[in-house]
Amino acid sequence: MMKPERKTHPLLMIINNSLIDLPTPSNISYLWNYGSLLGITLVFQIMTGIMLAMHYSDNMDLAFSSMIHISRDVNYGWMIRFFHGNGASFFFICLYVHIGRSIYYNSYKLNYTWNIGIIILLLTMATAFLGYVLPWGQMSFWGATVITNLLSAIPYIGMTIVNWLWGGFAVSNATLTRFFSLHFLLPFIISAMVMIHLLFLHQTGSNNPLGLNSNTDKIPFHQYFSIKDLITMMLFIMILSFLVLFSPNILGDPENYIPANPLVTPIHIQPEWYFLFAYAILRSIPNKLGGVIALLMSIMILFFLPIFSKNCFSTSFNKWSGMIFWSFINIIILLTWIGANPVEAPYIIFGQILSVLYFLTFFWMPYSMVLFQKIIELL
């Protein structure tokens, strides 16, 4: 009997094994849909980004004007711009939910997949920061100045690295040009890393809500989960479209509608909302080098989760770990709120307390899992 073309053609076989006949645990929930949402959003961001790059000028005298030109003169330019800007926010929402689900259901036990995922997170954060600088408004300019200047905290070579990054002794035309080039390049590197992420995932198979081996209970990805993914994609597009068409600036900063002026400092310099939790941790350390280390460790600590926790139980079965996890989510939300506020009392002390709790959570959760397992064994 003749096999279908998708099972014999060398290229179609790759798509077939990844999207059609992929053996998938039958009990995965909607929380497993965020991976496909991230893939669609990445493609969407690359497409809108290329269209914006066709009309953008990477010159400090023309960058702000080119953004106004895109919004006013280019056919549907305002829509492309707002879809790209708000699409980045939605990308990070999906990314954080995806990571949160992996922590909650112990998916970080798939070491290679998890580590590549964290590298993708770091690359995405770098891409988003570079993109935030491109409109060349007040917050773009001062955000670039403040955040890149943090590298000067590195002993001996810090200031040299900063000058090399800036292309001079201050944020200038050279800085904007290289930031634009890197912002254009990084999404394609992220796409390659996503392929590696999927390669490792399909080697081991996906995790499931029970946290158990599901080799005896798997079904094809298509049509069961492909339809399920399409429903969430439709909801995602509807919500994003509603935001873009009715409140496109709700997630942005009004300061960025003022052209960059190196002589006037904004009252409160802050990054985009999806970096505010890490920014609050940075500000909570009075020492500059200590703050930079804390900022890096707020993300890098995710690499150590598989080392900290060797437990086989999913957090969904462990009420103590569950309470710690949801407390951790509240800590991140509060840190985001504190990062959006000025550096003054009582935000300083609250930020310091929450930063300590943020890092302690990564030690409490594995310990609670071990304790819970010992109690189960005793019973």
UniProtKB/Swiss-Prot annotation:
- UniProt: heme b b562 binding residues: 84, 183
**Cofactor(s) required for function per UniProt:** heme b
Q: What are the subcellular locations of this protein?
A: Mitochondrion inner membrane
Look up keyword Electron transport and say if it applies: yes
Instruction: Please tell me where heme b b566 binds in this chain.
Output: 98, 197
- Is Metal-binding given among the entry's keywords? yes
What name does UniProt use for this protein? Answer: Cytochrome b
Name the species this protein comes from: Epiperipatus biolleyi
Lineage per the UniProt record: Eukaryota, Metazoa, Ecdysozoa, Onychophora, Udeonychophora
Gene that specifies this protein:
mt:Cyt-b
